[in-house]
Amino acid sequence: MATSKTVLPDLDLAKIRRYCEGRVPTRLRDRIRIELDVRGRSVTIFECRPPSTPEIGSDWTRFPIARLRRVAARGVWMLYWRDSDLRWHLYDRVAPSPHVDPLLAEIEADPTSIFWG
């Protein structure tokens, strides 16, 4: 079931949140965090880093890693990657899935180094 704020299944959102929270050990979270933004049918995963110098300010830099998009009509999730021109493209090395688990596994494995570098 989806919450009133989103059109995405609560269980899937919880899995994505757990993935993000578990990606970086607690002891390193003052230097790097993995966060997510939910907008409509999409969840974007970000790598976040603190400013390199205090003069820059206190805002962390957010670099988009991957986007998961729910296609409700088909009941599947699709995975996207971002290019250097800031455009999103369908990642075609993993099939759309009714569950986020295989897509999160592909992001983690990153066989093409397109997500984590």
Predicted regions and their residues:
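Generic preference for hydrophobic/aromatic residues in regular secondary structure cores
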Residues: 36-38, 65, 88
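Short, conserved beta-strand/beta-arch hydrophobic-aromatic motifs that form part
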Residues: 46-81
